[in-house]
Amino acid sequence: MPNDKIAAVGANIAEKAAMIWNVADMLRGPFKPHEYGLVILPMTVVKRFHDCLLPTHQAVLDTYEKVKKLQVIDGFLQKASGYQFYNTSRFTFETLLADPDNIESNFRDYLSGFSANAQDVLAKFDFNNIIKRMVESNTLYLVIKEFGSEKGYLGPDKISAVDCGYIFEDLVRRFSESFGEEAGAHFTSRDIIYLMTDLLLSEADLDTSSMTVYDMAMGTSQMLSCMEERIHELNSDIEVTCFGQEFNPSTFAIAKADMMIRGGDPNNMRFGDTLSEDQFPGFTFQYIISNPPFGIDWKREQKAVEAEAARGEMGRFAPGLPKISDGQQLFVLNGLAKLANKGKMAIIQNGSPLFSGDAGSGPSNIRQYILENDWLDCIIQLSTDMFMNTGISTYIWVLSKDKPAHRAGKVQLIDASHCFEPRRKSIGTKRNDITDACRELIVTAYGEFANGKVYGDKNGIYCESKVFESVEFGYNKIVVERPQRDEAGNILLKRGKPVPDTSLRDTENVPLVQDIDAYFAREVLPYAPDAWIDHSKTKVGYEIPMTRYFYEYQAPEAVEDIVARITVLEQDISAGLAELFHKEG
């Protein structure tokens, strides 16, 4: 998506956000700031439903009168409404506002007129109790009036599905901040999503008739929306079917509402914890795009995850389990389990999955599983300050089960940490954007698959590509023993073998591409001639030290320059002191 289109979406978001904050002003007092979202999120969904259905409202009422005595009426009413949902109530926001004395009963009548799938969305918000509180505080009519105003209009002729999706996400962000939650946990900005979509689709077969896309931690489902939008920009005839799972009730409700409005199958949006309550067992997908939580523990899911891991290949987590404090690698394993034989996945991670965990540990075993199956295609390091809730460096992992021949057995690393434009105004900790030009550089680097090539200007915006053999990330961790000695310096023996001195025990990481014995003879024996390897303790490990691969030596400042700078500083200080004491005298 070009920047001017993103800017237009931003303007729509800003306009609607201003209206919504006016509603927040009305709630001040009866509702605490962290409760504003309990009112505004479901009201925004209701108003979006209303404005989408308004043009066909009378047609639905007429159809309902004809078919209401039939046992199955959904199909008729959905056809009349033009959507996967409908409302058979005679009320609209306009007629609700015309009768303020009966606003509660009429509004409840209006809500009860929605189809079952829309009712399910509203149930996730616990909206009935919120309505009761608005009635008790005399704010229900005021809130409906504000949403019913011209500036509260959310119809699809003015607000596209993508626009509305980002309005929802902006609201979630604002109210998560006021609640003290992880503010960006449900929000991935469009610049990052469009980079991910272009990486996924850069080698795609666009002559196909259909594609499936899955997001395992979908939030409000904007990654799915953007992926579908991008596919249709490339080929409008492709039938895109989206699937998603989400554990937060409010964001799930928004995602399901968005899917209903876009005409997709709302049953593909499923509620539950992805790690412990997989809603898509046995499913596989052609594309997976996701930004699961990182740095979050999985204690809540521990029992279910460990039980599934014990099932071996019948489950998703057989390759290994990460440390309990960070479950992001579990989402990677979930994605790989659901990736079709020719599928491709883009998933956001922090730095931990690159190197955390020693040889033989769960995190290392997961990396080994990915690399030895040749599924890791590319890792792109983004700049810091790209997300609203964290300023740390983040990485896009691209995994493929159908690498082209020239990429087989290899992994591409792209350092795009210098490929950004500073924002004029930050959003939380998001101070940097991936512009069209930045995205083009990164996608070009990915497509060309060059080793040691810089794209852009190293004095400005650029990214750098390097290509490695997959085996280069592996190593054998060997245990080096040395013997105990008595006071006379003689080696202590037990059953004719030297007794190891645990205080002198050491380890060495020997690259998989090197012979262990040759390495030992070259790197250890010259310095410890009495040492030996305990081969029973050798373990295979994998790590991806991305920072080391792109490190550039910076020569220290010359001693002469440092001395000259210190001399100038000393002279300045001396002059300042002399002037000070001269004035005091």
Description of each model-found segment:
Residues 232, 260, 264, 293, ...:
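Hydrophobic alpha-helix feature that most strongly marks membrane-spanning transmembrane helices
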Residues 388-482:
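Flexible, glycine-/basic-rich loop-and-beta segments that form/coincide
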Residues 225, 253, 290-292, 329-333, ...:
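Feature representing long, continuous alpha-helical segments
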Residues 26, 35-45, 252, 321-399, ...:
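Conserved Class I SAM-dependent methyltransferase catalytic core
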Residues 1-204, 268-279, 381-384, 408-415, ...:
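Non-catalytic, mostly N-terminal accessory regions of nucleic-acid modification and defense proteins
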Residues 183-290, 294-306, 350-352, 359-366, ...:
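Conserved S-adenosyl-L-methionine
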Residues 297, 301-325:
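Conserved catalytic motifs of ABC-family nucleotide-binding domains
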Residues 284-285, 326-328, 342-350, 376-377, ...:
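Active-site lining segments that contact anionic ligands and/or coordinate catalytic metals
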